Regions:
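N-terminal periplasmic "start-of-domain" segments of outer-membrane beta-barrel proteins
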Residues: 36-69, 97
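Extracytoplasmic beta-strand/coil segments of soluble accessory domains associated
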Residues: 79-115
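Short acidic/polar hinge/loop motifs at secondary-structure boundaries
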Residues: 97, 116-143
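Short strand-turn segments of transmembrane beta-barrel domains in outer membranes
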Residues: 146, 158, 162-192, 203, ...
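Flexible loop and strand-edge segments within Gram-negative outer membrane beta-barrel domains
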Residues: 208-221, 229, 233-306
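Conserved C-terminal beta-signal and adjacent last beta-strands/turns
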Residues: 228-229, 519-617
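Outer-membrane beta-barrel signature, preferentially recognizing the C-terminal barrel domain
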Residues: 253-276, 388, 392-394, 398-456, ...
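Gram-negative outer-membrane beta-barrel transporters
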Residues: 319, 323, 356-358, 363, ...
Length: 617
């Protein structure tokens, strides 16, 4: 072990010790009144759970907050969540890569209304990173190994997006926004109830020249959700989200014009039937995701689809025991211009027990078996627990395994530059975490920290052969460990704030050369601060700060740190009309999103200001 690695391991041990000391101090504080944590979390167990009972680290962001903060796409939403890094150049129409705990986008499972967006071609879940911020019900981030619940790719965690369920009297909002770089946005959305039918929808169109030459982007999106109560015990529903982008990508400052033209069309559809009989609830879900991608310049065309049938049973055996079990069938289809249409099926069985073992003690035990007809079988398991103390301190710990099946490109590509290997095996991972959460003043003030680690074996990597040719092999290993901490508070009714910090050490070991290097693009430190002030019932002002430190590109080349500041404001003239304004990259920070010796530096968008009007009826 090198001296540098020893120092990092020692730092990790010191921070873990400080975490334990903090818990001891906090648990000595006198208990106050009962606390309430607000929104439930579904993705951590596949059932509705209060955050105070969870033994793992998870966050939920409601659609109302996305609307209030004027996040126009998911890239901005994810930047404020601890343990998550959304790497993007901010240009309209471009995409981002979502990383959780140092794991790249292909090792983070993303889902929209139950449909997986990690496809056989685009394994990093391209759709959800640029997904529209309109008509969202909730965005959940569940960290750590989650293959026991969801199967392949859930190594670093799971990102779940849910379309809003209509509630109350029907109401509609028209949004129009103009801004820097000849940008405009038009959106119409609505939601409500009509008898036994709940409905919501949105349609939006955006265009921008963006900042660079030959860099224009266009994006259209839609969503809808319908839920209908057939009877007191049976509900059916259908939802869909679609994104259609057309983007001129300059690629990098070493790439000569013209820009590469990228067109991407993605549609996700899911439908469900849910029945309840006393203590037994069944939910049957069918989902489909279709994605088409076309790139000019270096011509690339990819077409992929995911199909899924999921049957989940939830049985409340007693007040202290809930069982969850079911089966999943999945089919992936895809092809690109290097290999013909291919498909793969997967059958899975899963089971989970949620146990209230004593006062304030909650345990979760689960297992799953996946059988891929191409990649083989894989069994995963997990266990986690939470202990709520009288001091309103929650201690928690979790351990589990996960895997990632190889995608079609790495299996079947016929290109000599990246020849597929049909003998690839799934990557395997094991992870653990320990942490605490502390609640004060009926949950108005919350703070906590988590120490985590996950190790990956049989890492699929590109292996050069001769000249510019190469293929793929299960050769290397990877390690991610670090610390997440947060403080959130509502000091007054008109002032709320959130502070989050993430430290991540992320490295891969080349087992053929016995060398270790930091994984590209992963920040060593992330700090985010969000403040929101409501001066009265009409005027809202918000300020967000994100500081990113310690990234490296391929070849261990340092990438510049950067500080992003955004502000937003809404003034409500009446129940029908509001004026909005937002500023992105307020300090006009000039920073590099990514760098390669081949294409050069990819700069991020600079200072941008937007103003708009909202009309409600």
């Amino acid at each position: 072990m090198t001296t540098q690695n020893r120092l990092r391991k020692r730092t990790f041990a010191i921070k873990a010790g400080l975490l334990g000391l903090t818990v001891v101090v906090l648990t000595s504080i006198k208990a106050g009144e009962r606390y309430e944590l607000g929104p439930y979390i579904v993705g951590a167990t596949r059932t509705e759970r209060d955050a105070s009972t969870l033994g793992i680290s998870a966050d939920v962001l409601l659609g109302s907050e996305v609307d209030r903060k004027m996040y126009r796409d998911l890239r901005h939403v994810l930047f404020d969540i601890k343990g998550v890094y959304s790497q993007s150049d901010e240009a309209l129409g471009s995409t981002a890569e979502v990383m959780i705990r140092g794991n790249s986008g292909s090792r983070v499972l993303t889902m929209v209304d139950g449909a997986k967006t990690n496809t056989s071609i685009f394994s990093n879940g391209r759709f959800i990173t640029g997904a529209s911020g309109f008509n969202l019900g909730r965005v959940e981030v569940v960290r750590g190994a989650q293959s026991t619940l969801y199967g392949s790719s859930a190594i670093g965690g799971v990102l779940l997006l849910e379309t809003r369920q209509g509630r109350g009297t029907p109401r509609y909002t028209f949004t129009n926004e103009l801004g820097s770089f000849n940008s405009f946005l038009t959106a119409f959305q609505g939601q409500g109830e009509a008898g036994e039918l709940d409905f919501s929808f949105h349609a939006a169109s955006q265009e921008s020249d963006n900042e660079l030459s030959d860099n224009e982007g266009k994006m259209k999106s839609y969503s809808f959700r319908l839920d209908y109560d057939l009877s007191e015990n049976t509900t059916v529903g259908i939802s869909s989200r679609g994104e259609f982008t057309d983007y001129s990508n300059p690629v990098g400052d070493l790439t000569p014009p013209p820009s590469t033209r990228v067109q991407s069309d993605t549609i996700a559809v899911s439908a469900y039937v849910k029945t309840s009989r006393e203590n037994w609830t069944q939910k049957f879900t069918a989902s489909m995701l279709d994605e088409y991608y076309r790139q000019t310049g270096f011509i690339y065309i990819g077409d992929a689809a995911n199909w899924s049938l999921d049957w989940q049973n939830t049985v409340d055996v007693s007040d202290s025991l809930r069982l969850v079990a079911g089966s999943t069938w999945e089919r992936q289809e895809g092809n690109d211009n290097s290999f013909p249409e291919s498909e793969s099926d997967n059958w899975a069985l899963f089971a989970q027990a949620e146990i209230e073992a004593g006062k304030g003690v909650n345990l979760v035990l689960g297992a799953r078996h996946d059988d891929y007809h191409i990649a083989g079988s894989k069994t995963t398991w997990r266990a986690n627990g939470a202990w709520e103390l009288p001091t309103k301190t929650k201690l928690r710990a979790a351990i589990g395994t996960a895997f990632r099946a190889p995608n079609f490109f790495r299996l079947f590509s016929t290109s000599s530059f990246a020849l597929g290997n049909p003998n690839l095996k799934p990557e395997e991972s094991k992870s653990w975490e320990v942490g605490f959460d502390q609640y004060y003043k009926n949950g108005a003030i919350q703070l906590g920290a988590t120490v985590f680690q996950n190790d990956i074996e049989d890492l699929v990597v590109y292996v050069p052969t001769t000249g510019f040719d190469g293929t793929y092999a299960n050769r290397d290993s990877a390690e991610n460990y670090g610390l997440e901490a947060y403080v959130s508070y509502q000091l007054k009714e008109n002032w709320s704030a959130n502070l989050a910090y993430t430290w991540t050490e992320s490295s891969a070991k080349d087992l053929s050369l016995n060398t270790t290097s930091r994984l590209p693009g992963v920040p060593r430190h992330q700090i985010s601060l969000n403040n929101e002030f409501r001066f009265d019932e009409k005027w809202l002002v918000g300020l967000g700060v994100n500081y990113v430190i310690g990234r490296e590109s391929f070849g261990s080349v340092d990438i510049d740190n950067y500080l992003l500041v955004r502000g937003y404001s809404r003034y409500r003239f009446s129940d029908a009309v509001s004026l909005t304004a937002r500023v992105e990259n307020a300090l006009n920070e000039d920073y590099t999103v990514s760098f390669s010796s081949f294409s050069g530096r990819v700069p991020a968008r600079g200072f941008a200001v937007f103003a708009g009007v909202e009309w409600r009826f």
